Each structure stands twice: as structure tokens, then as C-alpha cells.
């Protein structure tokens, strides 16, 4: 069995980092809303494509979101969703 067939384990646990991600996402959300965009659609577009053009420069939203890796943003979103449904692994 090659190493490509094995499941890799990824561990990342830093609650202070999660708070930073939440702060950035909320700031970006507010900036998108102020500019008249659908914040969810724009953030999802950015997360899927990596194209910062989905995020406006308004209120430095583009600079803020680009300080974080997309995989870190996605991980925090998944953890938050699962936590809100009582499913997060402690």
C-alpha cells in the first residue's frame, strides 16, 4: 500500500487563532454588506477560488482576509458549525 492510500491526520488546535479568524470574517462581512454585496456569496467565492477580487478593499477587508490562509478560514468555519450542533470532537 503506497503512502498515498493512507489517511493522513491533521491536528490544529488554537482557540486564540479561532478568535482572530472570527474577528476577520465579521469585519469582512460588514465591509461586504456596506458595499451592497451578498457577504456569504462573496466569502464563499473567495474561499473556493482564492481570488481576492471577491473581497473589496473597503475597510481593508481584502488585506485582512489575505492575512489568513484559506484552509485556516475553512477549518474555523467547520469547527464553528459543528460546535453549534454539538458535534465537535473535544
Curated annotation (Swiss-Prot):
Disulfide bonds: none
One protein family per Pfam: IreB
Matches recorded under InterPro entries: IreB (IPR009309)
Homology family: Belongs to the UPF0297 family.
Protein name: UPF0297 protein ABC1593
Protein's organism: Shouchella clausii (strain KSM-K16)
